[in-house]
């Protein structure tokens, strides 16, 4: 049999083989201390010894346990709770994250971070996805990219329906703009989301994760020109027209990181370093972990930011709407 079954396709771990279950192509099961991968749809009562339907992982050029392409294997297991730095460090050591082995960690696996406020379940969205990206703060490849399993909280992007300068006096940038449109203080970076909500999330997580919550650089939109036509189409006006590198510990995802392409993003300045789809979204849809509406990082128009829709569609919403918050963080 040719040893090309796996290639670059994704494997989905299904645990121990069950005779009562049916399986789909690329499902992987454990059986008699071995790992087997389905070559086609497998009917019930078809054990992995049936080579018409199954192939042993080693025969398929899949090495176990540390040779997996972890960005191509989805599992979705509960890994427990972390409420202290000591627990996190024990977790990182147990799973050999620093060496890049990622032992017994797979896409969709999640852990509850007990930060005292958000207490969210964070799932593995990718392994080393942010490696070597940035201007000054550059993560290495031996890191976990995490996103909340569901909405961490709800918040507006801005206090008014604008993707321009925030009118919120609580926004730290207001002291410099006084609410007057100023290039470099608009779009995602100038928003209340980036300046108020994200820093609060970062502070709460840092109290538990310490320096293992990595500071990284994002190349995000900073200027919005209301007269520039948006690539969102349908006559929408208002687009991101400049960007800059900014150091963050948490940031909303781009459309590309979720969908694999832009939909409502107003211009190339909405993508930046977030130019590739997170591996987890090769296995689940944006509503695959529950129906919810949540913000994305892209400007859609002068009044709207991009979002992921409750019913499983790409969307955009008025900036003052309170919607779900699901930031991307990097831990290692």
What are the language-model segments listed below?
Residues 64-332:
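Collagenous Gly-X-Y triple-helix signature in extracellular proteins
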């Amino acid at each position: 049999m040719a040893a090309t079954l796996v290639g670059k396709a994704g494997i989905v771990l299904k645990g121990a083989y069950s005779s009562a279950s049916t399986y789909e192509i690329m499902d992987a099961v454990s059986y008699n201390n071995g790992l087997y991968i389905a070559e086609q749809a497998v009917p019930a009562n078809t054990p992995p010894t049936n080579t018409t339907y199954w192939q042993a992982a080693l025969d398929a050029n899949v090495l176990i346990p540390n040779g997996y392409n972890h960005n191509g294997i989805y599992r979705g297991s509960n890994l427990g709770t972390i409420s202290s730095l000591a627990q996190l460090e024990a977790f990182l050591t147990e799973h050999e994250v620093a060496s890049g082995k990622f032992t017994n960690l797979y896409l969709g696996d999640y852990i509850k971070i007990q930060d005292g406020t958000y207490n969210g379940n964070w799932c593995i969205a990718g392994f080393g996805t942010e490696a070597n990206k940035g201007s000054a703060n550059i993560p290495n490849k031996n890191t976990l990219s995490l996103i909340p399993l569901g909405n961490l909280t709800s918040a507006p992007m801005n206090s008014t329906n604008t993707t321009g300068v925030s009118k919120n006096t609580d926004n730290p940038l207001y002291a410099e703009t006084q609410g007057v449109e100023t290039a470099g203080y608009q779009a995602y970076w100038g928003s209340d989301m980036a300046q108020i909500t994200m820093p609060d999330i970062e502070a709460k997580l840092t109290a538990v994760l310490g320096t293992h919550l990595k500071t990284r650089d994002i190349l995000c939109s900073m200027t919005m020109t209301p007269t520039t036509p948006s690539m969102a189409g349908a006559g929408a006006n208002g687009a991101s027209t400049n960007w800059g590198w900014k150091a963050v510990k948490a940031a909303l995802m781009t459309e590309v990181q979720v969908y694999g392409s832009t939909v409502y993003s107003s211009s190339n300045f909405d993508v930046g370093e977030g130019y590739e789809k997170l591996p987890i979204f090769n296995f689940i849809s944006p509503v695959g972990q529950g129906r919810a509406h949540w913000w994305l990082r892209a400007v859609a128009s002068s009044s709207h930011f991009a979002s992921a829709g409750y019913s499983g569609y790409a969307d955009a919403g008025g900036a003052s709407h309170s919607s779900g918050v699901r930031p991307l963080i990097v831990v290692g």
